[in-house]
Structure formats: structure tokens, C-alpha cells
Amino acid sequence: MWFRQLALFRLPPDARPDLAKLEAGMEQHCFAPPSGLEWSSQGFVAPAGHAPDRLLHPLAGGALATLKREDKVLPAAVIRDVLESKVADIEAREARPVGRKEKRELKEQVTDDLLPRAFTKTGRTRALLDVQAGWILVDAAGQKAEALVSALREALPPFPARLPHTQLSPGSAMTGWLAGEVPDGFELDCDCELKSPGDDGATVRCSKQDLTAPEVRQHLDTGKVVTRLGLVWQERIRFVLTEQLELKRLQFLDVLEEQASQAGDDAPALFDATATLMLGELRHLVADLIAALGGETEA
């Protein structure tokens, strides 16, 4: 249930979505497995097993959403083996070579024949919609995070979620924090990555190391900048901040897990307690992090 990473998308104050309208739109984009000749499909599914009819699971000040994607897996070697067999059969039966164009057409035919029987690979991407604070918090990064936001946009256009921009770039801020003082509420953890400027610059990765040690600081003296930095927030959440303002290796510490477990052994109650607690904690963490980066800018 606990998120393991975080991508941030901003919802403008004057464009916070109506969750009832959003859920109605999501119902038009429910997940369905890819049909015979489709390579993949995606759509929304219920985030909570105990509420199978709800595509948005309501929480205090927000909701939880899940996008499911299914991809068919058809190895190129399988297609090649079947194609070679067909080509050999034609050449033996008709005593003629099979040309390039015909091979291409045969390959398309073989692919179409095999696709309905292909294995599938399934994945889910979850997001917290923090309507109260105006954030979409996605448990993914890169294309997967963008795909979920795009799916929400299709469900309720225009859904103007965007990547946030801060006064200080994460890279320059992290470099300053490693060289000097970390903002209130945060402390250095034990991992970081530093790079020399330029596309071909050297990269240094420190793991399970005291980041205040002289051998770490000397990399800053040579002009390297921090591109990833391990931080702990309020002794409650551990994470690695990246220069893209993504939170990797997100870990909710024991105090939060113990707090959630007070809901008891009832699975639905534990799910709801965990999701509600997670949304509240991430809401405060993101607010503190954005403030530490000097606040937001328009672009």
C-alpha cells in the first residue's frame, strides 16, 4: 500500500477537479484486456479490493486512483522461427525463393496469428489526488507517471496538471544543502550522487556513507554538483531527491506503520487508515520540500 516513489504534478488553484465528475469520466475509461490484434491496453481499475465499484477511493481531502496496463509479450525469436518455417515450406513446395516484400507480408501474417495467444505483462500505477493541497502524487516516474496523468486528462478534459517549477532548482539546492545546512525538518541520510558539469562529466555515487565526511565534501570543491541526495523528513519518511524533483526509494518509517496498524486487523479499515495517513504525511512533506526549494514559480 505504501508508495515507493513519487512524481509530483501541480493542480492550479482555480482548476481543482470535481472528484464526482472525474470518477464519472473515469468510468468511460475502465480497463479492458487488449483484444486479439491489440498489443496493449490501459484503463482505470478500483484501487481498493473492498470497494470494487469505486474507481476513485475517497480520502480526507482527496482520493486514490489506479491505472492498469497490460502488454502482450511476443518475443522476436518466436516470430522469426515461425516465419523461417513458413518461408522454407513455401520454397520447398513451390521451388522458388521468397522475396523481401513477401517475407515482410508473411511476417505481418505470423504476428497477427500469434498475437491473440501471446503472454501478457500487467502493471499498475497508483496516484493520490490531493485536491485540498492541489497535487497529483504518482507512485511512479517518467513515462508511467505521465501516462496516468494523461489518462486522467482524457477522463475529465482539460485537467491542467503540470510539472512544478521552483525558485531553486533541485540540483543547486541539494548542492547547497550538502555543502552547508539542510533546511529545517530535513536531515541528510547516507546516499548521494554527484556529477561534474557537462555531458561527459564524471559521476560519483556515495552509498551508506556519512555525507558530512571530508571525502564527500571534497567532491564539491572540485566543482561537482549534487544530482541525487538522500534525506530524512521529520524522522518519519526517508527518500532520495533527484534533480528532476522526483522522490525515489520512498520509505515510511516505523512510527508511521505503527500508527496505521492501530486500525486493527480488519483489512478494509487498515487499507483506509494507511491511505489516509499516507496522503496526510505526503501533503506536509511536499509542502516543506517546495518551501525548502524557495517556493513555486509559474514556469
UniProtKB/Swiss-Prot annotation:
Coiled coil: none annotated. GO terms for biological process: DNA recombination; regulation of DNA recombination. One of its GO terms (cellular component) is bacterial nucleoid. It comes from the Bacteria. One of its GO terms (molecular function) is double-stranded DNA binding. Keywords: Cytoplasm, DNA recombination. The keyword Lipid metabolism does not apply. Pfam families: RdgC. Signal peptide: none annotated. It is found in: Cytoplasm, Nucleoid. Its main location: cytoplasm. HAMAP family: RdgC (MF_00194). NCBIfam families: PRK00321.1-5. Belongs to the RdgC family. May be involved in recombination. This is Recombination-associated protein RdgC.
